[in-house]
Regions:
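Short, surface-exposed beta-strand/loop micro-motifs that present aromatic residues
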Residues: 81-85, 212, 542-546
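Short, solvent-exposed loop/turn elements at domain surfaces
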Residues: 101-106, 232-233, 563
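Compositionally biased low-complexity segments enriched in polar/charged residues
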Residues: 1-62, 66
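Noncatalytic, helix-rich "gating/capping" subdomain that lines the substrate-entry/channel surface
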Residues: 126-445, 481, 499-503
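Hydrophobic/aromatic-rich, well-ordered segments within soluble, folded domains that form packed cores
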Residues: 83-103, 249-267, 654-656
C-alpha cells in the first residue's frame, strides 16, 4: 500500500473518530440539558419568588392587606387561640395538631363526599393511583386495538359497566337450575364442590376448601378446610342476648330487618319469575345454624393456632366427610387425592358436616345456597351493585356514595391483568433514588430493632436468640413482588362480567390444583371477594406489608411517593414520621402477637419459652387496656383485642423511629436546642401523618371490623409511652397523654 493511500486512510479514520467523539459530546450535552431541565422541576432548585409562588402569595396575603404588621397581629391571635384551646398537647396531642384539618375536611365532605369512609392520605393517593392505572389501560388499548391483549383488556375494563342484563339473568337462571339439580339428585358434595370451584363465591360455602401454603412448611402448598364468612360482620347481631338493653335490642332488630329486605331485593332482581319461592328469613335462620355449628365443642384437642392436620382416613372415618368423592368434583382422583389436610377448626368441621348431612337439601338451605351466588353476581353488574351498596355500603359501613363507575373497573382489571398493571405502573413511576433511600432506611431501622432486642432485659437467652435470628433473616422487598408471571389471556366478553370472572376463577383454581402438595412457586394475585379489595402484593397498592409466612417486608412502588416520602422539600423528621413510621410498624409485625408465632424461615413454630410468652401476654393486656381506656374518654366502647397486633406494631414502630432520629442527631453532632426542635417536629409530623376524617356513620362498623383502631388512638397511645415525648411536653399523671408506664414492648 502506498504512503499517500495510508495517509488518506489514517486521515479518514481520524475524521471518523472526531465525528464519533463530537457525537458523544453532543449527546452528553443533550443528556445534561435534559437533566438540568428535570432538575429545574425540583422545587429546591427553583427560585422562591417564581411566578406561580408570587401569585400564591398575593392570594394568601389578601386578608392581611399585604402588611407585615397585620401579619404579626394575625399570628399573635392564632397563638392566643391555641393557648385558649382545651386540646393541649399533653392532653390530646392528636386533636391539638389535627383538629383544624379535621374540621375543614368535615365541611368539604358535606359538599363532595368520597366513596371511601376513611379520608386520609392513603385513600386519597390510592384513588389517584387507580385513575393512573385506568389511564395506562386506555392508552394501551388505543394503540393496540386489534391485538388479542388489547381486546381482552378493553373487554375486562368495560364488562362491569356494560353488563348485559339478559346475559346476567341467564347466568342467574343457570345457577338456579344447577342447585335444583344437585338437590334433586341428592348430590351434596357436588353442590359443595360447585361452590368451592369459584373463589368469588367459595368464601361463603359451609365448608371452605383452599390450596394455600402450609403454615409449618410454607414452601409447600396444601389443602385447607375452614369455616365460612357469614353475611353479617358482627356475629353477636345474630344472637338474642338477655343482657342486651333496649337500645341494643332495637339495633339488632333493625339490622335483621334491613338484612332480610336486602336478601329479598336480591332475589327479586335476579329471579324475576321465581323470587317468590324464597324468603330472606331462611338465609338468616341458616346462618344462625351455621354459627351454632361453628361454635360447637365436641372435640377437645383443638390447636390454638387453627392448625389441625387430618389424613384422608381421619376425615372420612372420624368426621364423616367423604373427602375422596369431594375431590373427584375437581377431577382429583386416586393417588392424587391429598392425604394431608389442614383444618382450622375440628369442632366447626365436624358439626358443620353433621349439619349439612341433615339439612343441606331443605328449602331453607336451598335459599342459602342460591343467595351465596346471587349476592356476588349482583356486584359484577354496576347497576345491580347499587342493591349491594345500599345495604353493605350505606347502611352497614356508613359509606355516603358508591364507587365511581370508572373506578369500579379496577377490581376485574387487577384480577385479570395484575402483571400488565404492575409493568405499566413501574414503567411510568420508577424512582431509583427514592427506592435506595427507603431501602437504606428500612435496613437502618432493622439494625436499630436488632440492637433493641440485644439490649432487651425480659427475654430469656433462647427466645432472644430466635428473635435476633428472625430479624437478621428478615427480607426487605421493594417495588415489585419477587415472583411475577405473565397474565393469562382468555376469551373475554365485553358485556358479560360473570362469565369473564368465572372463567378466570376456574383457570386460577386449576393452577392451584397443579401445585397442591408441591413446592412450586406461584404468582397469583389475591383478592378479598368479601370486601372486594386487593390484598396481595400488588406494586400499585399504597401501603406496605409484613408477611409472616415469608418473614419479609414488601414496600410497593405506589407507596414511594408524596406525601409518604418527600426528598424535595422535607427533612429527616418528616420522612421518618411518614415513611419511617410505616417501615418501623411493619418491622415490628415480625414480633407482634401473630408474627411471633412464626420463625425466621416463615414457618409456624413456637420458639418462645412459656415464661417469656407469659410476660409478653401481660404486655398485650396492658396495651388493650390503654387503647380501650383512651377511647372510653371519648365515649367510644370497643374491643381492642381484635387489633392488638396493629397496636403493638405502632408502639414498637414509633419507638424504633424515635431512636433512629436520636442516632441521626448524635452522628450530626446537633446541639441540644436543635435536638429538641427536631423531636418536636417529628412528634407533630407523626400526628399529621395519622390524621384521618372518618364518617360518623362508619365508626360502628370500623370498630368491629377494622384491625386498626381509630387514628386518634393510633397516634396518642404510642406517643404517650415515649419518655422523650413526656419530658418535652411535661406530661404528668392526670394529663390526657399520660399512661402508667413507658413500655414500648421491646
Amino acid at each position: 500500500m502506498g504512503k499517500s493511500v495510508k495517509h488518506k486512510l489514517k486521515k479518514k479514520n481520524t475524521t471518523k473518530k472526531r465525528k464519533t467523539i463530537t457525537e458523544i459530546i453532543n449527546n452528553l450535552k443533550k443528556s445534561r440539558a435534559k437533566e438540568l431541565t428535570e432538575e429545574r422541576h425540583n422545587p429546591l432548585l427553583q427560585k422562591l419568588f417564581r411566578k406561580t409562588n408570587v401569585e400564591k402569595i398575593k392570594k394568601l396575603s389578601h386578608d392581611l392587606d399585604d402588611n407585615m404588621d397585620e401579619y404579626i397581629k394575625f399570628i399573635k391571635n392564632k397563638i392566643s387561640s391555641l393557648k385558649d384551646k382545651k386540646d393541649r398537647p399533653k392532653d390530646d396531642f392528636y386533636d391539638y395538631v389535627n383538629k383544624v384539618w379535621i374540621d375543614k375536611q368535615t365541611k368539604k365532605l358535606e359538599d363532595n363526599p368520597k366513596y371511601y369512609v376513611e379520608v386520609d392520605d392513603f385513600r386519597i393517593v390510592q384513588d389517584k393511583v387507580y385513575n393512573e392505572l385506568l389511564g395506562y389501560v386506555d392508552d394501551y388499548v388505543e394503540k393496540n386495538k386489534s391485538s388479542r391483549k388489547g381486546k381482552a383488556l378493553e373487554a375486562i375494563k368495560n364488562c362491569v359497566q356494560k353488563a348485559d342484563k339478559k346475559k346476567g339473568l341467564g347466568h342467574c337462571k343457570d345457577v338456579y337450575e344447577r342447585i335444583n339439580k344437585y338437590i334433586d339428585t341428592n348430590d351434596m358434595y357436588g353442590l359443595l364442590g360447585d361452590a368451592n370451584s369459584n373463589e368469588i363465591v367459595s368464601w361463603q360455602a359451609p365448608i371452605v376448601w383452599r390450596i394455600t401454603p402450609d403454615e409449618k412448611d410454607n414452601k409447600r402448598h396444601v389443602s385447607h378446610l375452614s369455616s365460612p364468612e357469614l353475611g353479617i360482620y358482627d356475629y353477636l347481631i345474630y344472637i338474642d342476648d338477655p343482657k342486651d338493653n333496649a337500645k341494643e335490642k332495637e339495633f339488632k332488630r333493625n339490622f335483621k330487618r334491613k338484612y332480610i329486605e336486602f336478601i329479598n331485593s336480591v332475589f327479586k332482581t335476579v329471579l324475576p319469575n321465581n323470587y317468590k319461592e324464597f324468603k330472606g328469613e331462611d338465609v338468616w335462620d341458616t346462618e344462625i345454624e351455621l354459627l351454632t355449628a361453628m361454635g360447637c365443642n365436641k372435640i377437645k384437642k383443638e390447636d390454638a393456632n387453627y392448625y389441625n392436620v387430618l389424613t384422608k382416613k381421619e376425615i372420612e372415618e372420624d368426621y364423616g366427610f367423604n373427602w375422596t368423592y369431594f375431590m373427584e368434583r375437581f377431577n382429583i382422583k386416586g393417588k392424587y387425592v391429598p392425604n394431608k389436610v389442614i383444618v382450622s377448626s375440628l369442632n366447626s368441621f365436624k358439626c358443620t358436616t353433621e349439619l349439612l348431612k341433615e339439612k343441606w337439601a331443605s328449602n331453607k338451605w336451598k335459599t342459602y345456597w342460591m343467595f351465596m351466588y346471587y349476592k356476588q353476581m349482583i356486584r359484577l353488574d354496576y347497576d345491580w351493585s347499587m342493591i349491594y351498596f345500599n345495604f353493605y355500603g350505606k347502611f352497614v359501613k356508613g359509606k355516603p356514595v358508591h364507587y365511581p363507575k370508572k373506578t369500579y373497573s379496577i377490581f376485574p382489571l387487577s384480577y385479570a391483568f395484575n402483571t400488565f398493571l404492575t409493568k405499566e405502573y413501574i414503567k411510568h413511576n420508577k424512582k431509583p433514588i427514592i427506592e435506595l433511600y427507603v431501602k437504606n432506611m428500612v435496613e437502618d431501622l432493622k439494625y436499630i430493632f436488632i440492637k433493641k432486642i440485644e439490649r432487651n432485659s425480659w427475654l430469656s437467652p433462647s427466645t432472644k436468640k430466635s428473635a435476633l435470628l428472625k430479624l437478621n433473616k428478615l427480607e426487605v422487598q421493594m417495588v415489585t413482588p419477587k415472583y411475577i408471571t405473565e397474565d393469562t389471556i382468555l376469551e373475554y366478553i365485553e358485556d358479560d362480567p360473570w362469565y369473564n370472572m368465572t372463567a378466570l376463577s376456574m383457570w386460577r383454581l386449576n393452577q392451584f390444583i397443579k401445585i397442591e402438595g408441591t413446592e412450586k412457586k406461584v404468582d397469583i394475585p389475591a383478592i378479598d371477594w368479601n370486601e372486594f379489595k386487593l390484598v396481595g402484593t400488588q406494586t400499585y397498592m399504597v401501603n406496605a406489608y409484613y408477611r409472616p409466612t415469608s418473614n419479609s417486608i414488601y414496600v410497593p412502588l405506589a407507596y414511594l411517593q408524596k406525601p409518604f416520602i418527600d426528598m424535595d422539600q422535607r427533612g429527616i423528621e418528616y420522612n421518618l414520621a411518614y415513611m419511617g413510621y410505616t417501615l418501623g410498624h411493619e418491622l415490628s409485625h415480625s414480633l407482634d402477637d401473630m408474627g411471633s408465632k412464626f420463625d425466621a424461615d416463615g414457618n409456624m413454630n413456637n420458639w418462645w419459652t412459656e415464661h417469656d410468652r407469659k410476660i409478653f401476654n401481660n404486655k398485650i393486656k396492658d396495651v388493650v387496656k390503654q387503647y380501650e381506656e383512651f377511647a372510653g374518654r371519648d365515649g367510644i366502647k370497643f374491643n381492642a383485642e381484635i387489633g392488638v397486633g396493629e397496636d403493638l406494631a405502632d408502639i414498637s414502630g414509633l419507638s424504633l423511629v424515635e431512636e433512629y432520629l436520636f442516632y441521626f442527631q448524635l452522628i450530626h453532632r446537633s446541639t441540644t436546642v436543635i435536638k429538641n426542635l427536631s423531636l418536636e417536629a417529628f412528634y407533630v409530623y407523626s400526628a399529621i401523618q395519622s390524621r384521618q376524617k372518618i364518617y360518623d356513620k362508619a365508626i360502628p362498623a370500623q370498630l368491629k371490623t377494622n384491625p386498626h383502631p381509630l387514628e386518634k388512638y393510633r397516634c396518642n397511645c404510642p406517643l404517650s409511652r415515649l419518655k422523650l415525648f413526656r419530658e418535652i411536653y411535661q406530661v404528668k399523671k392526670g394529663d390526657g397523654m399520660y399512661w402508667h408506664n413507658t413500655d414500648t414492648i421491646w
